[in-house]
Every structure is written in C-alpha cells, then in structure tokens.
C-alpha cells in the first residue's frame, strides 16, 4: 500500500487486529522512508464476494452506490442525514449482508436495509419501505 501523505512511498504493516464481531481488519501502517504512521480499516467488498440471485436465474453484483442513493432518498425529512449518514448506513448494511450465510437477493437487501434504517431513524425506515 502507498502512504496517504506521500503517494510515492511504500508502507509496511506494524500492527494488525481482526474484529471479532464484524468482517473488518484494523491495520497500523508506517511509511518506509518517512516513518509516518496511519491507520486503515479493511473490509471485504460484497460486490466481489457474493452475487445477487435475481428472479429467472440471472445474477447481478452488489452496488454500494445504488444502496447509498436509495438510503439518502429515505431522508426527505433530514437533509443532514441524507448527506452525511447514507454512506455509513450503506456500509452497515453491506457488513450485515456479507456476514449472512444465505443467498443474497434483492428482497434480503431491502429487508436488511429497512431494519438498519429503522434502528437509526424510524421515519427513514418507513420512507424506505414505502
């Protein structure tokens, strides 16, 4: 990986921890030349690991951007949440789905998104379900 402050520099991992509850890895990295230290959080991309089973036997890939937009559209009542919380909520949904052992379907994505939104903002959950 390259350094965030010096893109021409390579880095090395000096410390690493896996989460026990989520599919995420925390890594402390250090630039080899400058010694600058920074932290990264690595998580699997659902689009590369689980195909979405569509009706009729076709498959599609998970699209985080599409999910972010559909979540943002649920926050008509809260523009701040639409702008700043949609990404984090979509990533929460993606983590939940990546830990789920079942087949990934549009209905499963919608249900997981609805439950996540309801926990965060009940009105947004209702708007999403509508």
Tell where the protein language model's regions lie, with residue ranges.
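Short metal-coordination and nucleic-acid-contact micro-motifs, chiefly zinc-binding Cys/His arrays
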Residues: 1-2, 7, 25-27
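Cys/His-rich microdomains that often coordinate metals
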Residues: 7-11, 38
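A structural signal for short, hydrophobic beta-strand segments that form beta-sheets
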Residues: 13-15
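Short linker/helix segments within small regulatory modules
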Residues: 17-26
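Acidic surface patches and DE-rich sequence motifs
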Residues: 19, 31, 54
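Alpha-helical scaffold elements adjacent to nucleotide-binding pockets in ATP/GTP-utilizing enzyme cores
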Residues: 27-30, 70
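Short metal-binding segments enriched for Cys and/or His
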Residues: 30-48
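Charged, amphipathic alpha-helical regulatory modules used
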Residues: 42-130
